[in-house]
């Protein structure tokens, strides 16, 4: 049995005990993951995760903070707004992956007070968005930051996001298209994501599928169903569009909603 499987079998009390102890950093790491996976609302769990954002004991060989990363990820899934300010502070972490996880969780929490700190990570624009020296990633988690700004509704960041449409990395361009559609509702941004479904690289087609699902772009339904990618991902994308559409139609199933359901049925 793997460590993940063992952790999954924990009870709430075991997970809380494991994150509170200090001798075994591995157990603390898995406990943070456990709280996020099971969306635990227990106040002890929330407080332990908030404390874990400042942990100094669990360090990776490259100087990173594994426990902080998992804590930041989990706090977004719990939906507790008490995490907003600590996550904003985590955007200044020296660990790229902590910053990335914090941005993703702030997107989930959707609190507008995170906007200035997220915008700050776009400082320098595309010219500054280069590979970190000796690392496999860029200097900032631009994809996560741009997506968060779009989801939160940071219209003040439109001018800062637009230049990223020309970034050399496709996923960052897609993030910019996604955010700009969310912030402007201009169809040409979503249509460019639809065009990306015809790209040569499967990984990029997958990204475009998820982005179209995230923005709820109904006209993309047919293109998503026909895309060369796993049916499971196409279903996730269509489900996202349907859920967004139902929110806009006050849960009324109209012709567009029925078509989306039919497309989903065709993929099962």
UniProtKB/Swiss-Prot annotation:
Keywords: Antenna complex, Lyase, Phycobilisome. One of its GO terms (cellular component) is phycobilisome. It holds the Pfam family HEAT_2. It is an enzyme of class 4 (lyase). The keyword Nucleotide-binding does not apply. GO terms for molecular function: lyase activity; oxidoreductase activity. InterPro entries: ARM-like, ARM-type_fold, PBS_lyase_HEAT. CpcE and CpcF associate to form a lyase. Required for the chromophorylation of the cpcA gene product. This is Phycocyanobilin lyase subunit alpha. It comes from Picosynechococcus sp. (strain ATCC 27264 / PCC 7002 / PR-6) (Agmenellum quadruplicatum). The gene is cpcE.
